[in-house]
Amino acid sequence: MKFENKIDQKILQRRERPREEDLRGYYFRDTTAIIHSYPFRRLKHKTQVFFSPKNDHICTRIEHVMHVATISATLCKALGLDVDMAWAISLGHDLGHAPFGHVGEKILDNLLKERGGRFIHELYSLRVVDHLVNYGKGLNLTYAVRDGIITHCGEQFEQEMRPDFEYKNLKKIKTLGSYPATWEGTVVRMADKVAYLGRDMEDAIQLKLIRNEDIPGIVSKRLGSKNSEIIDTLVNDISSVSPRKGAIALSDPVYEAVMTLKSFNYDHIYENPTLAGYHKFFERILTTLYGYLLECFEKYGFDFQKYNQERNMLSLRFADYLKKMHDFYKNMNGGFDNLVIDYIAGMTDDYAIDSIKEIMIPRNLESQLEKFIIT
């Protein structure tokens, strides 16, 4: 089967604000825009699964998205699809992730639920590229890339996936469940899963949470015992099976082994008591930051100078953020529930921890705080 998108290329290449294209082409331009953005740069200091700031060889969020990009590009080459589109979707798919990985996402989601909202990183990644980058202006990406970002949903591992080829109002998507409009987006959705299963297992071994001999036999035999072997097996399987199935798909034996590995990872890694101990710290950090910043905003609103009264760098930086984003939030006509979450979700792990210190530990009199006071 030849994979072709049943949706007009002009729709896929459409931007919310018309612009003259250049020699990079539609989708490679999106790739460079994402790479140059601040949210992409911050991914190198955001947890993937393991909070391990002292170990340079444990996967961070930026390494994960690079794995997704290379896997997606390889599959697109094999299947005759648009590599540039897949690269852009891959690099942008996790820009909306919270600090401290999926645990941080759940914490922010619970905080927003109390105010009638939700925090879902797939949806939030679209908010980042559409609005939060460039002080409310966004990156002005193509429809195809925006669609692939919001529909990448990497948690459910389906054996076969097909695009819906629908032109959707992406801003109205409020829950998971939508499928990509393109084959390239579907490839990224599959590659997201391929990228994390073996790598999470390998990192867990390095951190001594599990041992090599703990890996189920069916996984070692059919997929491999190292991340590189697992990726190689899955990429080759998808490349050979997909044209026959008319879908981005895995064979039955490989899919069985994949689901075994996924169950193993959940039982022995993601729900490991050692990690659960860290989760309590992350909940205290993010909940405290949310409560403090929400209180500040409810007291001072957009009166930026009043944030000086708090006498800490977090409040001053938050005020500076509000000042730069004022036009965007002002045009929302209220509904500021997401405003504090926008700021916290953009934090790196280290910045969140430093911010807690700012509001919990007083500075000495010789500190340089005064030069940052907003005037």
Regions picked out by a protein language model, each given a short descriptive name:
Residues 1-62, 67-75, 82-83, 104, ...:
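Histidine-centered, transition-metal-coordinating active-site segments
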Residues 87-92, 96, 187-191:
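Short alpha-helix carrying the canonical HExxH Zn2+-binding catalytic motif
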Residues 96-100, 195:
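Short active-site segment of divalent metal-dependent hydrolases/proteases
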Residues 101-114:
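A glycine- and small-aliphatic-rich helix-loop capping segment at beta-alpha/alpha-beta transitions
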